[in-house]
Curated annotation (Swiss-Prot):
The heterodimer acts as both an ATP-dependent DNA helicase and an ATP-dependent, dual-direction single-stranded exonuclease. Recognizes the chi site generating a DNA molecule suitable for the initiation of homologous recombination. The AddB subunit has 5' -> 3' nuclease activity but not helicase activity. PROSITE patterns: UVRD_HELICASE_ATP_BIND, UVRD_HELICASE_CTER. GO terms for molecular function: 4 iron, 4 sulfur cluster binding; 5'-3' exonuclease activity; ATP binding; double-stranded DNA binding; helicase activity; metal ion binding. ATP binds at G8, R9, A10, G11, S12, G13, K14, S15. Signal peptide: none annotated. Belongs to the helicase family. AddB/RexB type 1 subfamily. Pfam families: ADDB_N, PDDEXK_1, UvrD_C. PANTHER family: RECBCD ENZYME SUBUNIT RECC. NCBIfam families: addB_Gpos. This is ATP-dependent helicase/deoxyribonuclease subunit B. One of its GO terms (biological process) is double-strand break repair via homologous recombination.
Amino acid sequence: MSLRFVIGRAGSGKSTLCLHEVQEELKQRPRGETILYLVPEQMTFQTQQALIGSEDVRGSIRAQVFSFSRLAWKVLQEVGGASRLHIDEAGVHMLLRKIVESRKDGLSVFQKAAEQNGFFEHLGSMIAEFKRYNVTPSNVYEMWQQLDAHSSSAEQKLLANKVYDLQLLYDDFERALIGKYLDSEDYLQLLVEKLPQSEYVKGAEIYIDGFHSFSPQELEIVRQLMICGARVTITLTIDEKTLAQPVNELDLFYETTLTYEKIKQVAREEKIEIEKTIPLMEQPRFHSPALAHLEAHYEARPNEKFNGEASVTIHTAANLRAEVEGVAREIRRLVAEENYRYRDVAVLLRNGESYYDVMRTLFTDYNIPHFIDEKRPMSHHPLVECIRSALEIISGNWRYDAVFRCVKTELLYPLDVRKETMREEMDEFENYCLAYGVQGKRWTSEDPWMYRRYRSLDDTNGMITDSEREMEEKINRLRDVVRTPVIRMQKRLKRAGTVMQMCEAVYLFLEELDVPKKLEALRIRAEESGDFLFATDHEQVWEEVMNLLDTFVEMLGEEKMSLSMFTDVMSTGLEALQFANIPPSLDQVLIANIDRSRLSNVKATFVIGVNEGVIPAAPMDEGMLSDEERDVLSAAGIELAPTTRQTLLEEQFVMYQMVTRATEKLYISCPLADEEGKTLLASSFIKKIKRMFPDVKDTFITNDVNDLSRSEQISFVATPEVTLSYVMQQLQTWKRYGFEGNLDFWWDVYNFYVTSDEWKQKSSRVLSSLFYRNRAQKLSTAVSRDLYGDKIKGSVSRMELFNRCAYAHFAQHGLSLRERDIFKLDAPDIGELFHAALKRIADRLLRENRTWADLSIKECEHLSTVVIEEIAPLLQRQILLSSNRHFYLKQKLQQIIFRTSIILREHAKSSGFVPVDLEVPFGMGGTGSLPPMEFSLPNGVKMEVVGRIDRVDKAEDENGTFLRIIDYKSSSKALDLTEVYYGLALQMLTYLDVVTSNAHTWMKKGHAASPAGVLYFHIHNPIVEVKGDASEAEIEKEILKKFKMKGLVLGDADVVRLMDNKLSTGSSDIISAGLKKDGSFSARSSIASEQEFNVLQKYVHHTFENIGKDITEGVIDIAPYKKGNKAACTFCNFKSVCQFDESLEDNQFRTLKDMKDSEAMEKIREEVGGE
């Protein structure tokens, strides 16, 4: 029994020496004593290849490469102890979830924390750490007793409570495993116990290579290996000079030196012979003087400079994508020009979550075979999502999001249906569920679902149309597709008495859905498209889910469990599932994490993402215990994993390992922005490399080829898939700025695409975008007639929409596009309710021959309650009755109508104007409807402007009859004459024109009427600020001011006083007008003369005629207006249709100039030739 160390700096040949010794031994004695070669898990594959990679050694039974866990399997198979079932990470998380749920009421700290994402991953890691560091539940309990006895501060009490929770959960976990199961850490403890019984290990020659440190548990394994084996050889990355000095935590080799001392101490304790250490002083790895210099002087202070041409390259990239593309181009160049194999190249990085998806996509585009040494979670696979969402449907009372997450896995679809058709039908079905707010018992009820198009509150027609009947049948058919398998599982789960029966319900759910056949179809499709990685995913996921169910049954099969706990435990297990890495092929680029990789002897290494806070890593407190808490435990004798501070000290060694992997070339790069455009800073580590290699230039990587030289641009000619976008970029530049003669090779590339049989069709579609203009072609007369007919009937809102954006009008009224209806209360619904409520109150007053002024406060409250109760069942499929939240909202809306009724009562008391009618239709046909506003357009098309007027008021005096329009709004609004001029605010003036033009036939007395004005009434329940001692009357007066109506009124003092009979001088509290002492109007009054009202009405007619002419002539320009901070696109539903983009030459806003009312009025006069 002896111990031998082989030490040396990185690249000194430690592993090579050991491998050569093993190979020589195998050549000389192929059947001798066992040779064990122990390496970290991630090194096993490459070490196995290296061991049998020589011509003399093509295979071996005598020598085997193991990791600690694989050696445990081997030994336990030999001597026994492996009869207990293995529990993987998913099983551990499930068991912990069950333990936490059962212990929840007794936990001090983790009761709420258990609901946070990642909690069980952290808890599992903490327990694994306890085991690796030989900390038992009793050790943790003793620690809690010490802490609890001496806790005085809040921090100390928190730690004591945390340790208490940990010991409870750890103890329960260990008790659950005893005699039944083994987790990954248990295998190592069993290995320690069983090694003395192993004949396989006894007398073996043992090599331990690639480790820098050992946990206490691993150190015990090393102890037993030294006792059982003939000789143990351990390699450590240490400079021999370090061993001659006192150990300093700032030393580059501090961690490995500590490991060296710990192992020697174990050898002394076991009286193991310690052979003379073999120090390796040369640098055989490095074929590059620059890389040899980097390794030899890495830790030197100040930095030793290397002058001359270096094989070290530094890149700064515009963004993360440009960085990865730069790496891909250089890898292809190395393979094409320097005879590299892909296996000669490695990419090292730390923040893989930011890079892996981009690298998979781009390396595939560049045809670079690659292997990412990182396990991927299964959580996004359709099968895992189907199980998780189906269980959430049942436990969460059929919520919309869970139902349609399950639907979109497409595993609920019948096996024999055409997926494309089913997807379209399910999209329609989802729209129905959103529009009708379907959830809860409606899914499980046997009552058929009804389908009716929601039209308005006034639509009381109960007849169902044929199209509605067809849609109803389709919806009920699709409902059964979705609910039948889930309800079947729901019933089985409710009947289940044990966990085994619950797992059986899940299994039957999957079998009845024909999931194995569906996954097989997905696998075949992936293989046919050449995506072999995803093909194997579909195989793996079924196997892993079945293993998970088996583990669940094995662990908890006979226990009883609530449905909610079962769902939580199952979801926890599903979250932990991971795809196994397929071993890399013989010729692939290896992409690996800096912290976990154990590469050796690759020719070129690319270290990417070298940004501040990433390399070196910023300190982060993660897991169950903070650094301070770990220090407290350490001081009390419980050794755990290194703290953040210790990890940061080790960062220098990690970075040293990172830059000493390559034999010929080292590339270091960082992006200046991430995928979202957020700024990133270069790491200080790059500055260090620049100081060591002052002649190395930091080159900038960009994907804009126009900024690069000819030779640099040529490197962008890679695969046809990738190069096509750069050809487009060049052609776009030449089109805009002209051709540069020295870049003619791009024409050769272009000619390849247009002449290649394979690429001609694909490239033509892309290249055609070069001449793309986002313009909507004018419709032909025939198409326009087909869309709009020979007679156009439209509302004022439709005409205003055309002036806001002609294309939006075309999308809504030509193509009849609509946003999907969602079961929610929007502003239009609230506005409709307000209108209907006030009309019902007004109609009741008219029937009773009363006015608003006759109402008492109590009657206002009563009537507002009555009408809201009448309307609520009719609004938006009874949305106000659908939930407690909406019921509360109904009460708030009733309060607003109550407040509005009070204000209308006050207005009526102060006004000579009385309502003539509400919701007055024009051009709608039927009794009581006024005629439409009619136009005969130059092209022969007839156009009618129709609508419904909120309220018409009338007043009479010796000068005649006056009419005014009141429009109810749920938000504050005023009449802007600039918007009238641009055709954006035509509604009120149109209404006024309709009622005054038809007064002689409409009014009962049959005589003409003059315009008195147009006013907006803001329906709301305002909050006012008053002094603390303000009386109720003062408060009511302030509230009344908040309801001042804005608009435009006739500039006649008598008419204004009819609107507010309390007004003598000053500003009115009711309308936006005021009088001076001399009887003239104040400057802030919104007034117009009768002649100006006539001009405005003429202008409205003129504008409508122009709009009608443009509509019928096929104008659909993508030309939205912009006026100040208002723009047509702000609330437009059709932005995704028109693709308006200001960066395109053709897409610019129609900027409308803001004007004073007087200036706008003058322009309006000019347009119609008014005086």
